[in-house]
C-alpha cells in the first residue's frame, strides 16, 4: 500500500448513475490514502466537487484492512453522493501496482449498487482509477475512468 499513500488530484468528466449525483459536467477530485494504527489499516477519503455548481458531488471514507478471522482483505465505508447518504462494504485484492475493490452499497433511500474500482499506480506520480461493472438497482451504468496526479503541495495545519 505504501506507493499509494498520499493525496491525488484531478479534473474529470462527472460519472453518473448513483442517486444524488448531477450527471454531467466536470468534477474536481481529491483522493487521499493514509496509514492508520501503526500501518495496520489504511483510510481512503474522497472529496469530489462539481466544478460548475461548486456543490459536493461525492465525499466519503473507506477503511482498508485485513479481517483477523479470515485473513482476507476487506473494505468498508460511508459517505454522500450529493446529499444522499450511503454505506458500503466489499473485498479488496492487491496485485503488484493495482488495488481492486468489489463493492456493495446501499443508500439511505434503500437504493442498492454494486461496482468494481480498479486503482492502478501507472508511475510514482500517476494513478488511474476505473469504475466498472456498475449496477444501480440492477440497472447497468456506464463505466468511468480518470487519471490523477500526486499532490506534492504541502500545507501547514
Feature roles, as predicted:
Residues 1-157:
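Hydrophobic small-molecule pocket/channel-lining residues, especially in calycin-type beta-barrels
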